[in-house]
From Swiss-Prot:
Catalysed reactions, as listed in the record: isochorismate + 2-oxoglutarate + H(+) = 5-enolpyruvoyl-6-hydroxy-2-succinyl-cyclohex-3-ene-1-carboxylate + CO2
Cofactor(s) demanded: Mg(2+); Mn(2+); thiamine diphosphate
Subunit architecture: Homodimer.
Matches recorded under InterPro entries: DHS-like_NAD/FAD-binding_dom (IPR029035), MenaQ_synth_MenD (IPR004433), MenD_middle (IPR032264), THDP-binding (IPR029061), Thiamin_PyroP_enz_TPP-bd_dom (IPR012001), TPP_enzyme_TPP-bd (IPR011766)
Keywords on record: Magnesium, Manganese, Menaquinone biosynthesis, Metal-binding, Thiamine pyrophosphate, Transferase
UniProt-listed Enzyme Commission number(s): 2.2.1.9
Enzyme class: transferase
Pathway(s): Quinol/quinone metabolism; 1,4-dihydroxy-2-naphthoate biosynthesis; 1,4-dihydroxy-2-naphthoate from chorismate: step 2/7; Quinol/quinone metabolism; menaquinone biosynthesis
Annotated family: Belongs to the TPP enzyme family. MenD subfamily.
Top-level division of the source organism's lineage: Bacteria
Upper taxonomic lineage: Bacteria, Bacillati, Bacillota, Bacilli, Bacillales
Any GO BP: menaquinone biosynthetic process
Protein name listed in UniProt: 2-succinyl-5-enolpyruvyl-6-hydroxy-3-cyclohexene-1-carboxylate synthase
Length: 586
């Protein structure tokens, strides 16, 4: 049994490494001992220990977002495995390749009342791209080949488009302590090679590219819409395509188009503020929209695309079905960057810029100027955090943005810059849970990293801070503390004053300083924007974990947002009125 266990788990772990999985997040447990010990002994694999499985899974998810390579998750049997579910749901919808390894009791101990034994078969349901319940360890050569093959298959399926989590259930009998030495690695490597997986990027046939180009070229009023998409080379390719087609790009903050050295002439970063005015939005209806990536954060954009059924929406996606408007006319199954390059190869550049694209860029300049000019100079305002961070963050930094209000403020107030910055968030299922853990996982490969997060989301994942202490991570957390769920103040529920605070505002009146210090972090509460800038700069220069709490008022925050949106609407309406009643692009 000892040889069977040692050789089998060693073959599986070595197969993972050979298939490109070189990072693992392990939570302690008895039944997972063989996997944990084999991973610890493998020279080609780096592992991070994380005690709480729920936090561990989000930590691994953040690692994958930053590294853009599959990461393995390892836990023991029972409810430990169930705690992975929220992060696996997020990984599924945000297309993050996780290789989830859950240790299990052997088949004879299932469904008979054995301790720490739950039904782990298909535990994650449709949120796992692929599931396998491994055979019990054997020391025969065919079974060692089987173990290596299953490892390679898991890694390949996780990384294949659309990427996502896979679940490998690993039943193990006692005794659980393997003997892992150099002889074991030599044995499993001589028995069989790990299958080599060759994969390419999805491309369209030339005739389909030509047909698509003719549709785009025929449009008088074209737009490109880019949601969350983090792909090397895409920014350069799509901005070149925008210039060639003379199509403005409505760029979500997670599209990676707002920051960097690429051409941003056609990048529209204030479209959310522009489209909030329905009268203005109704004058800006395009003929065609070419959409890349996930659906953007902006609700006005979503409603605009859904309401104007005359818009021909073309969704480019190499897998899955991402069209919540239910109005897409065409789906293009292609790698996004490859398609841009294919179109550029045959495109005929427009002879001159159209009034359509010029008007969009002029409106964007107006909106941006209004927002900047009317930001409060002294008072705390949550949106201003992003304009400040855009100045404070060094080139190459990563900004991780929490859900609810932070990501929406990033959409409005994170303006285009030539400084290379990477913007990440958990926008698959859009939950407020696990954000601290995800950001700290990303910080392993993306330093320096700044997380902007709300107080309820921070509270939800406080125990995720332990990772910073255990692994010596560098992260700056800007805690937007409005004492409750700030986003609900913008929703219809806010009109019901009686039950609102109890049901939706949910103030906690918590002071987080002692909790942060317990995890070895520094805590600061600035009283002025000057102090805020000082604490952020100090944290970036010092390293370690720092939490900077910005205390705001939910009521004042809503008032300032609405004031700014109204000012933008007024100035845009005035601008369009000066152009006359007929649209200049008709």
């Amino acid at each position: 049994m000892t040889n069977a266990l040692s050789w089998y788990v060693a073959a599986f772990v070595d197969g993972l490494v050979q298939a490109g999985v070189t990072e693992a997040v392990i939570s302690p447990g008895s039944r997972s001992t063989p996997l944990a010990m084999a991973m610890a002994a493998h020279s080609g694999l780096h592992f991070s220990m994380h005690i709480d499985e729920r936090s561990a899974a989000f930590f691994a998810l953040g690692m994958v977002k930053a590294k853009q390579r599959p990461v393995a998750l390892v836990c023991t049997s029972g409810t430990a495995a169930a705690n992975y579910l929220p992060a696996i749901v997020e990984a599924y919808y945000s297309r993050v390749p996780l290789v989830v390894l859950t240790a299990d009791r052997p088949h004879e101990l299932r469904d008979v009342g054995a301790p720490q034994a739950i039904d782990q078969l298909h535990l994650y349901g449709r949120y796992a791209k692929w599931f396998v319940d491994l055979a019990l360890p054997e020391e025969t050569d065919p079974m060692l080949s089987y173990a290596r093959t299953m490892a390679a298959r898991a890694a390949a399926i996780a990384a294949g488009a659309p990427a996502g989590p896979v679940h490998v259930n690993v039943p193990l009998r006692e005794p659980l302590v393997p003997t892992i030495d150099e002889a074991v690695w030599e044995k499993v490597r001589t028995v069989a090679e790990t299958p080599q997986i060759m994969s390419g990027r999805a491309t369209l046939p030339a005739e389909n590219v030509a047909a698509l180009y003719e549709q785009l070229a025929a449009a008088k009023r074209g737009l490109i819409v880019c949601g969350a998409l983090d792909q090397p080379g895409f920014a350069e390719a799509v901005t070149e395509l925008a210039r060639t087609l003379d199509f403005p790009i409505l760029a979500d903050p997670l599209s990676q188009l707002r920051a960097g050295a690429h051409d941003k002439t056609y990048v529209i970063d204030s479209y959310d503020a522009i489209l909030k005015d329905e009268a203005v939005a109704s004058r800006l209806v395009p003929d065609v929209v070419l959409r890349f990536g996930a659906m953007p954060v902006s609700k006005p954009l979503f409603l605009w695309l859904k309401q104007h059924r005359s818009i021909r929406q073309i969704v480019v996606d190499d897998g899955g079905w991402r069209d919540p408007t239910l109005e897409a006319a065409c789906f293009v199954r292609s790698d996004e960057t490859v398609l841009c390059r294919q179109l550029l190869d045959i495109a005929r550049p427009k002879q001159k810029e159209s009034a359509w694209s010029t008007t969009w860029r002029e409106m964007n300049d107006i909106a941006r100027t209004v927002l900047r000019q009317h930001l409060p100079a002294d008072e705390w305002f949550e949106g201003k955090v992003f304009t400040e961070l855009a100045e404070l963050l060094p080139a190459g930094a990563t900004l991780f943005v929490g859900n609810s209000m932070p990501i929406r403020d990033a959409d409005t107030f994170l303006f285009a810059t030539d400084k290379p910055l990477r913007v990440l968030a958990n926008r698959g299922a859009n939950g407020i849970d696990g954000v601290v853990s995800s950001a700290l996982g990303a910080s392993l490969a993306a330093s320096p990293l700044v997380l902007v997060i709300g107080d309820l989301s921070f509270y939800h994942d406080l125990n995720g801070l332990l990772a910073a202490k255990m692994h010596g991570l560098q992260a700056t957390i800007v805690l937007m503390n409005n004492n409750g769920g700030g986003i609900f103040s913008f929703l219809p529920q806010a009109r019901h004053e009686g039950p609102f605070e109890t049901l939706f505002g949910t103030p906690t009146d918590l002071t987080f300083a002692h909790a942060v210090e317990m995890y070895g972090g520094r805590y600061a509460v600035p009283h002025t924007w000057g102090e805020f800038r000082h604490h952020v700069a100090e944290s970036l220069n010092t390293g370690g974990l720092s939490v900077i709490e910005v205390r705001t008022s939910r009521t004042e925050n809503v008032q300032m947002h609405r004031f700014l949106w109204e000012r933008v609407s007024q100035e845009i309406a005035k601008f369009l009125e000066q152009k006359g009643t007929e649209e200049p692009w008709n």
